[in-house]
């Protein structure tokens, strides 16, 4: 059976105590005096931080993998260095959207040190035909491969995420391709219809308690319980409000992905 994602809506990281031997006067007369201490070696000058790589497209740039108007964006934070693997999230937009709409997450990419791949859906939304084997999943694969070939990505923190229609597709495809994407982020998603299940990805689900487009009782609450029953590691967050997503919810998802402490925005 073909599942079609057509829901509207997209919002909006000792000093060691010196060892002191209590030496009394009598002991001092009968013990060999200790050898003088060796003076400490001079401190080495601080090494300069690794410089940026000249061939890395820092900031936002086009994916450059589609001949059509629908392509997508790649965001590389200024903290990226070729010598250090960095977490990555493929972030999917909502209904009738563009990858460029994920620019709302670029500040979080800088804050937490995450590469963002933001492709455009092939049509008005994701998965309009043969989910799992459609043009969308092939394009997502090509976008991810380009990032992996050109950047040093952390293989232990590879996420597929999204909001609204993108969240439903991310949850479905993340479960189907859990041997590639070991983390899934679903925010205000309305569908979970994997064509198969591979691997055991960790999952972050967040949903608004008064979401009228994708009611929580039939989506977030239901999905998280089913996934927990199936043995998945699920982090679940409910937030007050409707289909729009508070910035702190997305911030918590990035903290979860990177393993860094979560602090609400001031």
Q: What are these model-predicted stretches?
A:
Residues 210-215:
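Acidic catalytic loop of the alpha/beta-hydrolase fold
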Residues 205-207:
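Short beta-strand/loop motif that positions the catalytic acidic residue
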């Amino acid at each position: 059976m073909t599942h079609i994602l057509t829901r509207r809506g997209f919002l909006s990281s000792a000093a060691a105590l010196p060892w002191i031997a209590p030496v009394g006067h009598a002991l001092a007369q009968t013990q060999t005096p200790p050898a003088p201490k060796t003076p400490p070696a001079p401190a080495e000058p601080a090494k300069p931080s690794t410089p940026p790589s000249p061939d890395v497209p820092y900031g936002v740039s086009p994916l450059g993998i589609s001949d059509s108007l629908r392509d997508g964006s790649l965001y590389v934070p200024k903290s990226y260095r070729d010598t250090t693997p960095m977490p990555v999230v493929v972030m999917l937009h909502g209904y009738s959207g563009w990858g460029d709409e994920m620019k709302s997450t670029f500040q979080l990419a800088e804050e937490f040190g995450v590469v963002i791949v933001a492709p455009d859906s092939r049509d008005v939304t994701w998965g309009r035909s043969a989910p799992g084997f459609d043009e969308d999943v092939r394009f997502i694969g090509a976008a991810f491969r380009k990032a992996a070939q050109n950047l040093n990505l952390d293989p232990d923190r590879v996420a597929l995420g999204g909001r609204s229609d993108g969240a439903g597709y991310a949850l479905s495809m993340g479960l189907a391709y859990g041997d590639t994407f070991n983390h899934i982020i679903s925010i205000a998603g309305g569908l979970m219809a994997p064509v198969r299940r591979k691997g055991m990805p960790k999952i972050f689900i967040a949903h608004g308690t008064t979401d009228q487009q994708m009611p929580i009782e039939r989506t977030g609450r239901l999905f998280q319980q089913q996934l927990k029953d199936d043995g998945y590691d699920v982090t679940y967050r409910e937030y007050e409000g409707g289909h729009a997503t508070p910035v702190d919810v997305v911030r918590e998802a990035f903290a979860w992905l990177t393993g860094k402490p979560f602090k609400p925005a001031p």
